[in-house]
């Protein structure tokens, strides 16, 4: 009975199971970590009111509408299990259980396998390393199964490079020992799982940073302060990435200030310091920095400074005071040396009696002592004299420059009087007695005569004029009583001083003495000695008197005393040849004409050839030209007709003889050879013949090798000046061409003007004779220089009937210089011959004044 009951129940359940068939689609599932997947539970059968439930691997019933593992009841016959973002813990057997209304259950299971795909967990890119370090390239790979890691660079397995620096570590990281900049690039970390045939890779960019290197272009930079100049400090920095450069001054960061004291270049590698002064002297450090590190370089800026006097002080002392000290302080770098000078002496450069360097220097007379220490110098004056007063200049000097400052020493002293004690004059002649006064403070000056203060009613012919440095007593003697002693007294708060002056009555001078008479044909030079007594006043003039033997009338002439006294000679002119004369002299001063000397007889020479002229040379500024002055001497009683000049370089042939008019007083020799010795011979010629040759020797300068450059920054010609020069040159060239056409072809603008305006004959007319006074001396077909001499009408009066010019004391032998007329030589292939200029003398002839004694 019991067995039958159990059989019935078994059949009942089997019938129910058949009626509820449960299936899960898909029947199995593999999910990669992080992926999502769903499973559908389907129920087949006629049962109603079924309940479909899902259970997790740990047996817990999954509730609907969960976020990550979701269960959704679709209808009476299906339900969906969805696993979002699966992880390893979600793996296991999930069960779908269907419960009928009668309580019967049916179920199905699905085995969910969750595996880890080959993924790169930690493989950042780029990865940066410092050059030279051991670099480890990180590549963390995660996978359910252990992967095989391969590293590639430039498409090749790094292991195959056979570079011992490349090592794959046990954690599959790639190590590069002592990584280099050339190792930079893309490295591929490739993972493989053989069981699944799975492969994945990650490209990692490897960057090798190079630590910066920095080098100062100059480790020491010199500059000068207070000149408004700028100085640039330069650092050359390299590295990767490009390093940033910053600057410090004595450890403090330098910023780009608003006043633009500091200026930086775009990459800050250059630091410009504007308006350098002494405060800018410091140690500057340029710091280059990037990811790989930093490096610095030092630059020492040395700022030199021109000396500057920072302290001087004026001093006051009393005469005969023991000593006084003047002090001078100066700044500058290098430390300046200080020297002292006055307006009359350079104290520091004088020979020293003792010299303890650098502290003490003493002058030979021991009056001044200079002490110097560092930037301070003092000048001590001993036994003060009034002459020590005045300006003292201290000068500070170093290699950069110098500075000077003046200070003043005041010396207070009693008056000191000076002046000519004896003063000469004569009755009616006004004279000043000068009393020079030296005093500090200023002195009051008084004049006395016989104890009586001047001026007074008793001395109406006396006036007094005072200046800061002297007092003048103006006396106009009326009688002998006005001559005698006068007293000058000066008083200040230090003391007083008096000086006696004597007013002496002047006399006329004594007679000059004639030493010798040098007669010529028409002139005579009288040598004399000045009078032994001048009478107390200067001699103003000399009077010469002469007459021919047998004549009663004396001829006379006045000569300026200064000119006559220079050589002690007066020249009398207008004499007749072969005639005996007597001559005598007298001197004139302010008092009057003195005694006349005894007469001295002489006889003039017969008419003869002239005396040789005196020659004096003056080199031209160009160095290869010379002006030879012709100083006319005695003409021998017959007018000089002309001068003959010849010259040559020593050891060379003579240049063609040059004929100069008698009025010429110099000749210009140009285009001479450089650094050559020349000799010049000049002969004067009159109707009687030629004089002896005057000889003159000179040497030209060495040829300059270069024209000195002008150092002035503003010496260059402006564009306008250059254009002006070119225009003037062009105009001169046109004029030269026109002049050439005029003289050679009788055509051109000048010829047109001459024909139409001046009435000159046309090109076909016969040329007129040359004007008087113009001559050209040349030889046909000669290559010798052509000398053209132009002068005004020569005055050549008949020697027998007219008077002629002789040198005298008022007309010097050298006659007035006139504008030169050049005589240019022809051009040859050899060096240009000398160019000769002559200057005529058109001075008015001196007319001899005759006066009777």
UniProtKB/Swiss-Prot annotation:
PROSITE patterns reported in the protein's UniProt record: FN3 (PS50853), IG_LIKE (PS50835)
Localization per record: Cell membrane
Cytoplasmic side: 738-853
Keyword check for ATP-binding: no
Name of a matching Pfam family: fn3
SMART domains: FN3, IG, IGc2
InterPro entries assigned to the protein according to its UniProt record, in alphabetical order: FN3_dom (IPR003961), FN3_sf (IPR036116), Ig-like_dom (IPR007110), Ig-like_dom_sf (IPR036179), Ig-like_fold (IPR013783), Ig_I-set (IPR013098), Ig_sub (IPR003599), Ig_sub2 (IPR003598)
Main location: membrane
Disulphide bridges, residue numbers: 41-96, 139-189, 235-286, 328-394, 435-488
Entry membrane topology: Single-pass type I membrane protein
Binding-site positions, heparin: 152-156, 161-165
Residues modified by glycosylation: 222, 314, 346, 432, 458, 487
Residues of the signal peptide: 1-19
Quaternary structure note: Interacts with MDK. Found in a complex with SLC39A6, SLC39A10 and with NCAM1; this complex controls NCAM1 phosphorylation and integration into focal adhesion complexes during epithelial-tomesenchymal transition. Interacts with synaptic plasticity regulator PANTS.
Protein's job: This protein is a cell adhesion molecule involved in neuron-neuron adhesion, neurite fasciculation, outgrowth of neurites, etc.
Protein's name according to its UniProt entry: Neural cell adhesion molecule 1
Lineage, top ranks: Eukaryota, Metazoa, Chordata, Craniata, Vertebrata
Gene that encodes the chain: NCAM1
